[in-house]
């Protein structure tokens, strides 16, 4: 049994009729003048920061617990960065933001909705006050793409996120806003990366159906795709293959299966005292994975890989972020996201639980 890594693509999925427009749950509550689709989250971020400012240099506050790709995209757009602290519950440290605001003018604040969650009432009220005072809110829902709440998600001036982390598509990200954006041409999404990743996804599907095929072949192509992604920083639109999938897939099945798998893992790992889910799932929250904290993260990650459970570390943060916030540093050293997505059922979740139990000898 193999769990995680890149999403395989079934050839049959490519024959499904296009029968819907692209929409996410948070969009039910609000209307947006502009929704644009990009090849990657970093393209959506860089595009946003390049075109939302009216002066030469802007200053943004980023959370200390953040992906280096976010930091790099903001820097490429020419913005200055300061980091605000987070709490151990992965919430905004309001006091830290106030301290930074007191040191000089800030144009924007970058808000991340972590691991399927949404904002607490106090942080939401604080952010809305800043928004009223003219601070631009850029809200990243890459971890909470399908999460829904009438207030606490989707409130940013610019709402963006990666789509490809959730679905069997080679690329994809979005930007939604009511703000005016210039009509700037975007490069085609047909790139070496999208082609190679698409091929790797098809090859993985074939490998899973016929284990006589060499796994190394699709892994090599997948690695070539990743290398291509990180050598081409062109802002691109989404590829035609991914755009087509977004108009034909069943979003409700994705949401339902992820919630069922996550809740099943939470309920059946309570006896494992060495791991802790990052937070309890609340109504409307849809997890990107079973995200846990463990003091033995690196050893656990290695053990899971040896047993064909391929996990993500969100994130190994930069030295600047570590220096800015010891809480973020501690979380970065202990966090791990175990796959529980729509590809899997209770059978695969039981296997994950068994592997976790073997690691701790229970």
Question: What feature does the model see in each segment?
Answer:
Residues 49-104:
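Conserved PLP-anchoring active-site segment centered on the Schiff-base-forming lysine
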Residues 23-25, 65-68, 141-151, 296-297:
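Short, polar loop motifs at secondary-structure junctions
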Residues 90-183:
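Active-site phosphate-binding strand-loop segment of PLP-dependent enzymes
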Residues 26-30, 71-76, 147-156, 206-212, ...:
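Short loop/helix-cap segments at secondary-structure boundaries that form the rim of catalytic
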């Amino acid at each position: 049994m193999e769990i995680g890594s890149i999403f395989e693509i079934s050839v049959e999925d490519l024959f499904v009729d296009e029968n819907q427009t692209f929409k996410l749950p948070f969009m039910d509550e609000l209307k947006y003048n502009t929704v644009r689709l990009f090849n990657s989250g970093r393209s959506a971020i860089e595009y946003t920061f390049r075109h939302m400012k009216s002066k030469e240099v802007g200053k943004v506050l980023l959370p200390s617990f953040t992906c280096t790709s976010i930091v790099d995209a903001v820097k490429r757009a020419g913005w200055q960065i300061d980091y605000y602290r987070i709490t151990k519950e992965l919430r905004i440290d309001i006091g830290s933001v106030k301290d930074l605001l007191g040191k000089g003018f800030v144009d924007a604040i970058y808000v991340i909705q972590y691991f399927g969650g949404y904002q607490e009432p106090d942080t939401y009220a604080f952010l809305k006050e800043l928004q009223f005072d003219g601070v631009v809110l850029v809200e990243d829902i890459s971890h909470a793409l399908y999460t829904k709440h009438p207030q606490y998600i989707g409130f940013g001036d610019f709402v963006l996120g990666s789509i490809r982390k959730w679905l069997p598509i080679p690329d994809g990200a979005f930007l939604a806003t009511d703000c005016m954006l210039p009509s700037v041409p975007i490069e085609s999404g047909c790139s070496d990366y999208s082609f190679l990743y698409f091929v790797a996804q098809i090859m993985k599907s074939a490998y899973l159906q016929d284990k006589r095929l060499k796994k190394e072949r699709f892994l090599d192509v997948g690695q070539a795709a990743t290398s291509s992604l990180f050598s081409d920083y062109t802002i691109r639109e989404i590829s035609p293959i991914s755009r087509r999938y977004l108009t034909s897939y069943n979003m409700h099945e994705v949401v339902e299966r992820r919630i069922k798998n996550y809740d099943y893992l939470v309920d059946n790992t309570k006896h494992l005292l060495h791991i802790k889910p990052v937070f309890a799932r609340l109504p409307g929250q849809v997890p990107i994975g079973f995200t846990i904290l463990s003091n033995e993260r690196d050893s656990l990650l290695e053990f899971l890989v040896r047993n064909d459970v391929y996990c993500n570390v969100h994130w190994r943060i930069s030295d600047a972020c570590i220096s800015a916030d010891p809480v973020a540093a501690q979380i970065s050293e202990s966090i791990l996201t175990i796959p529980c997505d729509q590809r899997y059922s209770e059978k695969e979740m039981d296997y994950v639980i068994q592997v976790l139990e073997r690691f701790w000898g229970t």
